[in-house]
Amino acid sequence: MRSDMNNTHPAIPRQAPANALNTSTIQPGAAPQQSMIRHIIAIDPDVDRSGVAFLHLPSRELHCEAKTFPELIDDLHATKQATDALGEPLIVIVEAGWLNRSNWHVQAGDSRRKAAAIGRAAGRNHEVGRKIVEMARHMGIETVEQRPLQKCWRGPDGKITAAELAQFTGYTRRTSQDMRDAALLAWVHAGLPIRI
């Protein structure tokens, strides 16, 4: 655990509101009711730096970061402690490309070597995602393995652009593609409107 880390995250309020909900009624493995969720952490797994989005639902405050695996696990632990102290529900959404039959981005003209490299990279990312899910569940955090969302945006390969994300979330800080994908995952899971 990093020594400079405190028990709160920028996307988590420091004091519990008067109407804070108690999570003691949520059964392990059962999906919590959408109205109860107050904090969503969405993760787009990557071998080097995963895209992570922290969404506080009551305020719609969104915070995006890129984290290495150890940093991410430390943040999950700290956020779990902070939300438990506030008595507020937390859920983690992990993009689970391994649930699709094929999530490779191979073009028709790619060589066998390139196709193998793409498959190897996808497999490594999938394993990171599985380990994130395993660690989050080990910490007692409600965790959802989410199939990748449909790619219907203006960016390369149908991925969401920074401008598109800013239009409906208001988040204008610099982001990587993994961070934007995580933010979109959190926003969609929360059922918040997407207007472009």
How would you describe each model-predicted region?
Residues 2-196:
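Phosphate- and other anionic-substrate recognition elements at nucleic-acid/protein interfaces
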